[in-house]
Amino acid sequence: MSMQDPISDMLTRLRNGQTAKKVAVKMPSSKQKVAIAALLKEEGFVAEFTVTGDVKPELEVTLKYFEANPVIEQIQRVSRPGLRIYKKKDALPSVMGGLGIAVVSTSKGLMTDRAARKAGLGGEIICYVA
């Protein structure tokens, strides 16, 4: 069976992994998934990520916990294949009053809502993480 929305699959694996108190989760790799994992690591939501394998690359994300509680409280897909959500630079959302991030796909690549606002770019809202 083919996967219709690989980004939703990634976010669901992260959410389920943290609910089950897993140390790490594995998933098929893609450039966009690696970019999202890099943003999550940069913002402190995950501990580490690695890409292994040449023929079928696999992304392994090491989850992060604080006092036995998951660091990611909420992770939600916004723009999806059936309904794309685009926002201009002035309309970019602030997640949990700035405590969370919105991952935005811009013409300059994936970045957080704060970085997109600073660069004066709008784009597709991929997901919210808090």
Swiss-Prot record:
Keywords: Ribonucleoprotein, Ribosomal protein, RNA-binding, rRNA-binding. One of its GO terms (biological process) is translation. Transmembrane segments: none annotated. GO terms for cellular component: ribonucleoprotein complex; ribosome. It comes from the Bacteria. The keyword Ribonucleoprotein applies. InterPro entries: Ribosomal_uS8 (IPR000630), Ribosomal_uS8_CS (IPR047863), Ribosomal_uS8_sf (IPR035987). Pfam families: Ribosomal_S8. One of its GO terms (molecular function) is structural constituent of ribosome. Belongs to the universal ribosomal protein uS8 family. Part of the 30S ribosomal subunit. Contacts proteins S5 and S12. One of the primary rRNA binding proteins, it binds directly to 16S rRNA central domain where it helps coordinate assembly of the platform of the 30S subunit. This is Small ribosomal subunit protein uS8. The lineage of its organism: Bacteria, Pseudomonadati, Pseudomonadota, Gammaproteobacteria, Vibrionales.
